[in-house]
Amino acid sequence: MSARIGAISESATLAVDAKAKALKAAGRPVIGFGAGEPDFPTPDYIVEAAVEACRNPKYHRYTPAGGLPELKAAIAAKTLRDSGYEVEASQVLVTNGGKQAIYEAFAAILDPGDEVIVPAPYWTTYPESIRLAGGVPVDVVADETTGYRVSVEQLEAARTERTKVVLFVSPSNPTGSVYSEADAKAIGEWAAEHGLWVLTDEIYEHLVYGEAKFTSLPVLVPALRDKCIIVNGVAKTYAMTGWRVGWVIAPQDVIKAATNLQSHATSNVSNVAQVAALAAVSGNLDAVAEMRKAFDRRRQTMVKMLNEIDGVFCPTPEGAFYAYPSVKELLGKEIRGKRPQSSVELAALILDEVEVAVVPGEAFGTPGYLRLSYALGDEDLVEGVSRIQKLLAEAKA
């Protein structure tokens, strides 16, 4: 067994989701808050485009490894429309979902030992992708007192002569935090000042609520353009997690290197999925607006219910579809004869006792928290959090 591959952990979020689905298939009334996956079907016009593509013989064959030219052009146009960032189709690589985009982006720019500053809490895939690419993730931790947002001062304290990249994610998975325009600009200017690469994940760009606003970092800080990599995809915006279409936007030399890698790893993304993605990014955002309205309603319900639990504090997320409550005050307390000492143990207790699946903060680099997705039906959401409320109300010193 390769030591490098053997050291990689499985996706904790997918593991929790798989366990919940297995229990449900066995007849258990499990409610799963583990998956970051919209509960809506993919819009019909996207599905119909895929059906037509299935019948078109030209999509039965190999196509360019870097993506269908028409999809790359549409992604460039969509990027200008949605964020104001102007790029050429030659700066786009179409990938098998956002995970491949992230790995290939890091692989294209990292040499062994290069450091990547990773704000925590972070999505589980980031540090593992960095390690696979030969880099070293360096955590910079923010907590609920700052809304899980790191400061320039924290980033500067983590910077060394080996630092090559800073990761920037807004809206965030797992916390739902969104950086203000001023704070995002300050981080971008700091990165530009020190000649760092920035990898920014914009997968949740359309899922922001209230007064929060999505802003694309290279638009705020044009000086970053030559050292900025954007990863994005159709999964979250268009309820297309299973279609597996993401993309990288980067300087052309990065795209060429990443495309070469992909040509040997997977070749082109499924043509049918690419045609579906073309319909998605070329269409209007009406379906997205409806989904966002539902997520916003669920967000408010979940946060209110979580904050009614003694020992739980949940900042209000401003984007994505996750709540990230602190449960540190509950650790060590007795609950149904057990004293969970970690959020891993507490999450296991919640699943065992009330059949609700949540993801522990250890998966995101910050023990003492739980991540709950509110991308599920309203009734299931209320029932699931109610079960958690009743269980945790039994906590005693």
From Swiss-Prot:
Modified sites of kind N6-(pyridoxal phosphate)lysine: 236
GO molecular function: L-aspartate:2-oxoglutarate aminotransferase activity; pyridoxal phosphate binding
Signal peptide: none
Gene: aspC
GO BP: any one term: amino acid metabolic process
Entry coiled-coil feature ranges: none
Residues that bind L-aspartate: 36, 123, 173, 371
Protein name as catalogued: Aspartate aminotransferase
Organism of derivation: Streptomyces virginiae (Streptomyces cinnamonensis)
